């Protein structure tokens, strides 16, 4: 097995039932860490109906959201964009953004961040 000091053996199996870790964020939203290292973060997240995250940006992180279930609305300084199931949206560094679930069903999506967002989130009041 190839391993880097401090990392799990690769490859390793992860799923919603067997994530690296689970967390609650925002207004009762769920997140499951699937890949979590300084170079790359991959998360599965769930937002209940009528929830939204805070407007924010990342100094150096590029993100890609891929919608699995439901429809997301992204608000950015460039406007509003609806992204439906089986569609994705890239967010470049320093772009103010937030994701909303304005629908009547749970929103589920994969979120890839490169590098990791740890220490790189600036919340806008």
Where on the chain are the PLM-derived regions?
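Structural motif
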Residues: 71-73, 80, 96, 106
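Short, conserved beta-strand element in jelly-roll/cupin
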Residues: 46-47, 57-73, 112
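Short acidic-glycine-tyrosine-enriched beta hairpin
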Residues: 78-93
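Histidine-centered metal-chelating micro-motifs
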Residues: 52-54, 73, 89, 93-99
């Amino acid at each position: 097995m190839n391993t880097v000091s401090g990392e799990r053996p690769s490859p390793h199996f992860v799923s919603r039932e067997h994530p690296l870790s689970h967390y609650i964020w925002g207004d009762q939203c769920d997140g499951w860490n699937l890949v979590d290292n300084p170079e790359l973060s991959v998360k599965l997240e769930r937002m209940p109906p009528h929830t939204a995250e805070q407007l924010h940006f990342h100094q150096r992180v590029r993100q890609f959201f891929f919608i699995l279930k439901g429809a997301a609305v992204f608000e950015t300084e460039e406007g509003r964009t609806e992204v439906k199931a089986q569609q994705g949206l890239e967010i470049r560094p320093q772009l103010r953004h937030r994701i909303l679930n304005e629908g009547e069903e749970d929103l589920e999506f994969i979120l890839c961040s490169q590098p990791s967002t740890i220490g790189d989130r600036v919340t806008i009041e």
